[in-house]
């Protein structure tokens, strides 16, 4: 409006979707006072995140895993629950298809009251691990914001994903559906 008032021709809303995408995390911090949260989960066609016996650590294929790692590399922090950590021992890093670390690594955040084993992969992460009980997600996000974190990638199991969605803290939901049945 100010440019137009001074005689400058203004064409509005050009590539506004792309601009919004670039600004999402910053705008979330400004508008809501917390980081932009992406909640990710993978499921089978029958809606399961894992087989009953826990043997399905990877239910998606290589393309989905590569996409997840690319998205991890754009996040400032990656959140997982202690159940996922104890069951799968994820590295919580962003890696290329050949296994090398991307230059930018998200800070690992583990939620839950149980202890993280001394030999857990999360303890080998390039950034120090943040371990919180996860009982107050708005407080967690406030703490992360105070640390300069603007983009959070939630990659826990159904309990953690549901908690962020239930508390209306998910700005983006990313679901990968594997072409398989686990039930």
What do these predicted regions represent?
Residues 156-158, 167-168:
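A short acidic Gly-Thr/Ser loop motif
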Residues 167-183:
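Flexible, gly/pro- and Lys/Arg-enriched active-site loops
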Residues 7, 75-76, 169:
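Residue-level detector of structured alpha->beta connecting loops
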Residues 82, 156, 174-178:
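Active-site proximal loops enriched in glycine and acidic residues that flank catalytic Cys/His/Asp
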Residues 1-18, 163-165:
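Zn2+-dependent cytidine deaminase-like catalytic core
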Residues 25-32, 36-153, 159-162:
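Active-site ligand-binding patch in enzyme domains
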Residues 20-24:
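A gly/proline- and charged-residue-enriched helix-loop-helix capping module
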